[in-house]
């Protein structure tokens, strides 16, 4: 009888053991998941900063060739396709960028020339897609890259 009871206990986990494991997994998830989500936001902000720096370089090359930045109306598209109005005489064959990417949150980058912060303002509106905000919702602009 003693041997039979011992063999039966060896066959599987008790409900209590399974509940303890589920609770431990839940506690670990409660600690790890928020830290992981914060890292995703940090990575998106870093990607937006890199995109803005690359577009800033392309805009500078555009100005070196054409003695001015694209107008607000021409926008960033002037870095990919030759603008027709006003005509650009020294537009680089192949353009200044291969394509325009959206920001890491799926929104268009904002471009204004002349800008309120400098010769041009180039920015992402952040996670919320609205001007202003804090944390991942904060705007990321070419004027904030040094921060």
What does each model-found stretch correspond to?
Residues 22, 49, 56:
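Conserved catalytic core of two-component sensor histidine kinases
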Residues 30, 38, 42, 64:
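Short, conserved catalytic or interaction motifs in soluble domains
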Residues 59-99:
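Short, glycine/small-hydrophobic-rich surface segments
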Residues 1-13:
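N-terminal leader/signal peptides at the extreme start of proteins
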Residues 16-35:
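Alpha-helical hydrophobic helix detector
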Residues 35-53:
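Aliphatic-rich helix starts adjacent to a transmembrane/signal segment
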Residues 2-3, 42-45, 57-60, 66, ...:
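Short, surface-exposed interaction loops/tails
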């Amino acid at each position: 009888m003693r041997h039979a009871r011992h063999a039966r206990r060896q066959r599987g986990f008790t409900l209590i053991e399974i509940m303890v494991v589920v609770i431990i997994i839940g506690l670990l998830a409660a600690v790890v998941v928020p830290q992981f989500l914060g890292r995703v936001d940090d990575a998106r902000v870093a990607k937006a900063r890199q995109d803005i720096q690359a577009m800033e370089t392309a805009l500078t090359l555009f100005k070196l060739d054409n003695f001015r930045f694209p107008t607000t109306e021409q926008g960033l598209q002037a870095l990919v396709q030759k603008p027709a109005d006003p005509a650009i005489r020294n537009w680089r064959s192949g353009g200044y960028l291969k394509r325009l990417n959206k920001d890491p949150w799926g929104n268009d980058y904002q471009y204004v020339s002349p800008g309120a912060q400098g010769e041009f303002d180039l920015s992402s509106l952040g996670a919320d897609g609205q001007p202003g905000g804090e944390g991942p919702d904060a705007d990321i602009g070419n004027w904030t890259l040094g921060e």
